[in-house]
Protein backbone atom coordinates (compact mmCIF):
# COMPACT_ATOMS: atom_id res chain seq x y z
CA UNK A 1 0.00 0.00 0.00
CA UNK A 2 2.85 2.36 0.86
CA UNK A 3 4.64 1.74 -2.44
CA UNK A 4 1.47 2.73 -4.35
CA UNK A 5 1.39 6.01 -2.46
CA UNK A 6 5.07 6.65 -3.22
CA UNK A 7 4.55 5.77 -6.88
CA UNK A 8 1.57 8.13 -7.09
CA UNK A 9 3.56 10.93 -5.44
CA UNK A 10 6.51 10.41 -7.82
CA UNK A 11 4.17 10.43 -10.81
CA UNK A 12 2.50 13.60 -9.56
CA UNK A 13 5.87 15.33 -9.12
CA UNK A 14 6.93 14.26 -12.60
CA UNK A 15 3.79 15.70 -14.15
CA UNK A 16 3.87 18.94 -12.15
CA UNK A 17 7.62 19.54 -12.45
CA UNK A 18 7.36 22.00 -15.38
CA UNK A 19 4.81 24.04 -13.44
CA UNK A 20 6.91 24.10 -10.29
CA UNK A 21 9.77 25.78 -12.15
CA UNK A 22 7.80 29.00 -12.64
CA UNK A 23 7.67 31.57 -9.85
CA UNK A 24 4.34 32.25 -8.18
CA UNK A 25 3.42 35.93 -8.41
CA UNK A 26 1.10 37.58 -5.91
CA UNK A 27 -2.12 38.73 -7.55
CA UNK A 28 -1.66 42.24 -6.11
CA UNK A 29 1.63 42.60 -8.05
CA UNK A 30 0.15 41.49 -11.37
CA UNK A 31 -1.07 44.13 -13.78
CA UNK A 32 -3.97 43.11 -15.96
CA UNK A 33 -3.92 46.20 -18.16
CA UNK A 34 -3.73 46.01 -21.92
CA UNK A 35 -0.40 46.80 -23.62
CA UNK A 36 0.18 50.41 -24.52
CA UNK A 37 -0.19 51.16 -28.22
CA UNK A 38 2.54 53.58 -29.20
CA UNK A 39 2.46 55.70 -32.32
CA UNK A 40 5.72 56.17 -34.19
CA UNK A 41 5.78 59.94 -33.72
CA UNK A 42 5.01 59.69 -30.00
CA UNK A 43 8.08 59.70 -27.74
CA UNK A 44 8.26 57.46 -24.68
CA UNK A 45 9.57 58.27 -21.25
CA UNK A 46 10.62 55.23 -19.24
CA UNK A 47 9.08 56.83 -16.14
CA UNK A 48 5.62 56.85 -17.76
CA UNK A 49 5.61 53.11 -18.42
CA UNK A 50 4.67 50.46 -15.89
CA UNK A 51 7.18 47.82 -14.83
CA UNK A 52 5.68 45.13 -17.08
CA UNK A 53 5.75 47.44 -20.12
CA UNK A 54 9.40 48.31 -19.43
CA UNK A 55 10.19 44.60 -19.20
CA UNK A 56 8.41 43.94 -22.51
CA UNK A 57 10.28 46.72 -24.27
CA UNK A 58 13.62 45.64 -22.79
CA UNK A 59 13.06 42.06 -24.03
CA UNK A 60 12.17 43.43 -27.44
CA UNK A 61 15.27 45.59 -27.54
CA UNK A 62 17.42 42.63 -26.52
CA UNK A 63 16.65 40.99 -29.87
CA UNK A 64 14.37 38.10 -29.04
CA UNK A 65 12.94 38.14 -32.56
CA UNK A 66 9.50 39.53 -31.75
CA UNK A 67 8.02 42.42 -33.71
CA UNK A 68 8.77 45.74 -32.13
CA UNK A 69 5.99 47.59 -30.35
CA UNK A 70 7.68 50.94 -30.90
CA UNK A 71 8.60 50.54 -34.57
CA UNK A 72 5.18 49.13 -35.49
CA UNK A 73 6.47 45.97 -37.19
CA UNK A 74 3.37 44.03 -36.21
CA UNK A 75 2.09 42.82 -39.57
CA UNK A 76 1.97 39.68 -41.66
CA UNK A 77 5.10 40.86 -43.50
CA UNK A 78 6.88 41.21 -40.18
CA UNK A 79 5.93 37.66 -39.27
CA UNK A 80 7.12 36.38 -42.64
CA UNK A 81 10.47 38.10 -42.25
CA UNK A 82 10.74 36.68 -38.74
CA UNK A 83 10.56 33.18 -40.27
CA UNK A 84 6.96 32.09 -39.61
CA UNK A 85 4.76 31.53 -42.63
CA UNK A 86 1.46 29.87 -41.61
CA UNK A 87 0.59 28.37 -45.00
CA UNK A 88 4.08 26.93 -45.38
CA UNK A 89 3.96 25.41 -41.90
CA UNK A 90 0.65 23.69 -42.68
CA UNK A 91 2.01 22.31 -45.98
CA UNK A 92 5.12 20.95 -44.26
CA UNK A 93 3.03 19.28 -41.57
CA UNK A 94 0.67 17.66 -44.08
CA UNK A 95 3.35 16.52 -46.53
CA UNK A 96 5.66 15.09 -43.90
CA UNK A 97 5.96 11.30 -43.87
CA UNK A 98 4.21 9.61 -40.98
CA UNK A 99 6.61 9.05 -38.12
CA UNK A 100 5.29 5.57 -37.36
CA UNK A 101 6.42 4.23 -40.74
CA UNK A 102 10.02 5.03 -39.80
CA UNK A 103 9.80 3.29 -36.44
CA UNK A 104 7.78 0.28 -37.53
CA UNK A 105 9.86 -0.27 -40.64
CA UNK A 106 6.95 -0.35 -43.08
CA UNK A 107 8.20 -0.03 -46.64
CA UNK A 108 6.67 0.07 -50.08
CA UNK A 109 6.25 -3.30 -51.73
CA UNK A 110 8.70 -3.85 -54.59
CA UNK A 111 7.08 -3.91 -58.05
CA UNK A 112 8.84 -5.28 -61.14
CA UNK A 113 9.52 -2.86 -63.94
CA UNK A 114 8.00 -3.84 -67.26
CA UNK A 115 8.31 -7.44 -68.53
CA UNK A 116 12.05 -7.97 -67.95
CA UNK A 117 12.78 -11.56 -66.97
CA UNK A 118 16.48 -10.94 -66.30
CA UNK A 119 15.98 -9.96 -62.69
CA UNK A 120 17.81 -11.17 -59.64
CA UNK A 121 15.98 -10.43 -56.39
CA UNK A 122 15.27 -6.65 -56.62
CA UNK A 123 17.83 -5.81 -59.30
CA UNK A 124 16.82 -5.97 -62.94
CA UNK A 125 19.24 -5.51 -65.84
Curated annotation (Swiss-Prot):
One of its GO terms (biological process) is blood vessel diameter maintenance. InterPro entries: Urotensin_II. Residues 109-111 form a propeptide. GO terms for molecular function: hormone activity. Its main location: secreted. Residues 1-21 form the signal peptide. Keywords: Cleavage on pair of basic residues, Disulfide bond, Hormone, Secreted, Signal. Disulfide bonds join 119-124. GO terms for cellular component: extracellular region. It is found in: Secreted. Belongs to the urotensin-2 family. Urotensin is found in the teleost caudal neurosecretory system. It has a suggested role in osmoregulation and as a corticotropin-releasing factor. This is Prepro-urotensin II-beta. It comes from Danio rerio. The gene is uts2b.
